Amino acid sequence: MLLLPLSVLLLLTQPWRSLGAEMKIYSQKTLANGCTLVVCRPPEGGLPGRDGQDGREGPQGEKGDPGSPGPAGRAGRPGPAGPIGPKGDNGSAGEPGPKGDTGPPGPPGMPGPAGREGPSGKQGSMGPPGTPGPKGDTGPKGGMGAPGMQGSPGPAGLKGERGAPGELGAPGSAGVAGPAGAIGPQGPSGARGPPGLKGDRGDPGERGAKGESGLADVNALKQRVTILEGQLQRLQNAFSRYKKAVLFPDGQAVGKKIFKTAGAVKSYSDAQQLCREAKGQLASPRSAAENEAVAQLVRAKNNDAFLSMNDISTEGKFTYPTGESLVYSNWASGEPNNNNAGQPENCVQIYREGKWNDVPCSEPLLVICEF
């Protein structure tokens, strides 16, 4: 009877892992020999005893070493797409790609601004007459032309309306003295004359009445001066209006100089003669202001003009007609060059923009006189 408790106690003192193995061994031994552990009676004809009660749970054993990692599991399915992250920095510039094919030509661009007006070309030879064009619109009224030949008297027309007063004309020449008029009324007393020579002392005369004050003569002189000043002012105003009328529309005034043109086109020598007959000379601009005044007349007539300067005496040395050297010049680029297919260029023309060029003196150009 004591062997059973001892067997149970022996089992409880064994580790759990070895317990299972021992139990398996004991089971096998029991099958081989039922009384190996428990001896009750001789094996012959004896019955096995009842199972004993389970023993108490033993103390927890020490934590074993970690096992070797198992094989990696299969990759799971991709999760849903996350929110779009912030824009990353630009990457470095890539290598330039190959040059593409030339594209088709683009549409024509807008017309550019008009360029500067070039210098006037040389006058070409007269071409053949063209076919008459259609009748144009009535143009503006032109300036007064030269007086024509007197025609035969026409029939008397209807009386026209009274015209507007004309501009003040130039002072006319003195006419023939008319017949003497009737004697007018006596005028005011004239100014006192100069004193005469001192005479001999005469006899004392009677005491006369008190004379008038000498201030009357002074006041009369002042009044006369005031009248003369008024007349002078009226003459100056009239001359100013006359000067404007003479200059309009083909004249320019700069300082004390007046530049005037009648629109004539002549050679250099004929142009000089025309200005001399008008008591002037060919235009001789001596400053930028005078040069611009001449250029304005050139633009108004749309024709280049002669200037008075030339190098007829000494090639390459341009002077005024008096022989004086130039004090101002405005040559175009590359001028003067004396280059006209062998024909000397000894005279000066002024372009519309005010630049100068040397030309043959025989070329017909606009005449502008200086007064």
Swiss-Prot record:
Disulfide bonds: C275-C369, C347-C361
Carbohydrate attachment residues: N90
Residue stretches making up the Collagen-like domain: 46-216
Entry keywords, A to Z: Calcium, Collagen, Disulfide bond, Glycoprotein, Hydroxylation, Lectin, Mannose-binding, Repeat, Secreted, Signal
Example of a GO cellular component annotation carried by this entry: extracellular space
Secretion signal span: 1-20
Principal localisation: secreted
Descriptive protein name: Collectin-46
Species this protein is from: Bos taurus
Lineage start: Eukaryota, Metazoa, Chordata, Craniata, Vertebrata
Gene: CL46
